[in-house]
């Protein structure tokens, strides 16, 4: 999108040169606010789904349910093949911030003080706590082996914010490492 027709055309030309628009066609929106809303809604949706899966992974932890097996069974249905596995938190340069950024923009740029986003806010809070929970599980596992956290050598694998990506920005495992280091574990 762009604020004028010429701006939209220039954006399309530029993006067509740097993106594979054959495989990933561009969708041109009428206004920049629509383009930004697409991005923020998509990322807030995914963050909300991951927060939802956090609820069910905690249920599974407590009741001995193999959540991986459950998700694999659900994925058999073509309409449910995109269900996500819960992890130690959301990361990357978009998911952790976009829900809050959208709310900020609505209040400060669009001057709308009436709208509230309770689901998005809850998802942000749940996802922010997931890394701490993973660190607590690590502490519990060490305690079960009669090993104090202080001085325990802990290897953290899978440090990117999602599988098959080499980018570690705002990774959930970063919070785990910080929390365990605060408790004097050797990372």
For the regions a protein language model found, what residue spans apply to each?
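Structural/interface elements that position substrates and couple domains in central-metabolism enzymes
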Residues: 1-187
């Amino acid at each position: 999108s762009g604020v004028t027709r010429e701006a939209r055309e220039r954006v399309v030309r530029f993006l067509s040169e740097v993106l594979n628009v054959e495989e990933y066609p561009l969708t041109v929106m009428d206004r920049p606010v629509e383009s930004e809303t697409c991005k923020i809604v998509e990322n807030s949706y995914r963050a909300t789904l991951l927060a939802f899966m956090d609820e069910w992974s905690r249920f599974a932890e407590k009741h001995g349910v193999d959540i991986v097996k459950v998700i694999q069974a659900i994925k058999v249905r073509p309409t449910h093949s995109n269900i996500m596995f819960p992890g130690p938190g959301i990361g990357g340069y978009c998911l952790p911030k976009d829900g809050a950024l959208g709310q900020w923009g609505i209040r400060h740029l669009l001057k709308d003080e009436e709208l509230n986003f309770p689901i998005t806010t809850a998802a942000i809070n749940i996802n922010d706590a997931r890394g701490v929970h993973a660190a607590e599980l690590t502490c519990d596992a060490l305690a079960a082996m009669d090993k104090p956290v202080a001085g325990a050598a802990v290897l953290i694998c899978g440090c990117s914010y999602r599988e098959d990506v080499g980018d570690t920005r705002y990774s959930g495992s970063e919070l785990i490492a910080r929390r365990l280091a605060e408790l004097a574990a050797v990372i």
